[in-house]
């Protein structure tokens, strides 16, 4: 993690939250400080209309407490994911959103590089 220029975390939403294993992994990282000012993008997905937005908000809150560099344009919620993503990855709207998120993350990486 220390050598990574950025981190992308993608999670489903389970019972209006992030999976316990992801939370546990983040808890282990807290004391290391490896996410401090590290550019991060966070993505949630669910088969429902909420797109995992509750899990995404929870994840974003945890990452911000850890002082990760997580601007709003590096957050993405994907609703109805089971209908959108095919083996070919052909959902155009989702593809556009993912490209925009990656552009925002690259800008965040550039800003972090200039600041250090």
Give the location of each predicted region.
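Glycine-rich phosphate/pyrophosphate-binding loop and the adjoining helix
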Residues: 69-116
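Helix-loop-strand module that forms the ligand-binding subsite of alpha/beta enzymes
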Residues: 1-67
């Amino acid at each position: 993690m220390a050598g990574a220029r950025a981190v992308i975390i993608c999670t489903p939403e389970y019972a209006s939250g992030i999976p316990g294993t992801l939370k546990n992994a983040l808890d282990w990282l807290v004391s290391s400080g490896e996410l401090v000012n590290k550019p991060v993008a966070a993505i949630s997905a669910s088969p429902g209309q909420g797109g995992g937005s509750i899990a995404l908000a929870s994840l974003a809150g945890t990452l911000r407490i850890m002082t990760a560099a997580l601007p709003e344009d590096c957050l993405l919620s994907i609703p109805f994911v089971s209908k959108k993503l095919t083996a070919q990855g052909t959902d155009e709207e989702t593809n556009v959103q993912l490209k925009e998120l990656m552009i925002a993350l690259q800008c965040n990486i550039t800003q972090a590089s200039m600041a250090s």
